[in-house]
UniProtKB/Swiss-Prot annotation:
Family under the similarity heading: Belongs to the MinE family.
Disulfide feature: none
A Pfam family: MinE
Protein's UniProt name: Cell division topological specificity factor
GO-annotated biological processes: division septum site selection; regulation of division septum assembly
Signal peptide annotation: none
Name of the gene encoding the protein in the UniProt record: minE
Length: 85
């Protein structure tokens, strides 16, 4: 193996591969949102409003997800990035 072969083997993924991966992420995200209840967006905004009473945060610092298992079990996951004091 020559030195040139070593550098040629580390090619960046093509733009088509990157676009395909991004599209798969978007489709998976939309499929996850399709099964959410009608009240979910309003509940998310109300939770953010309560947190804002105590801490200054922006919408991108809060992640709310509703996961549903096959066992008829729903899990509400809330992740908040709190600012430093």
């Amino acid at each position: 193996m020559s030195l040139l072969d070593y550098f040629k083997s580390k090619k960046k993924p093509s733009t088509a591969v990157m676009a395909k991966e991004r599209l798969q992420i978007i489709v998976a995200h939309q499929r996850g949102q399709r099964d959410t209840p009608d009240y979910f967006p309003q509940m998310k905004q109300e939770i953010i409003a309560v947190i804002r009473k105590y801490v200054q945060i922006s919408d991108d610092q809060v992640s709310v997800q509703l996961d549903q298992n096959d066992d008829n079990l729903s899990v509400l996951e809330l992740n908040v990035t709190l600012p430093d004091r």
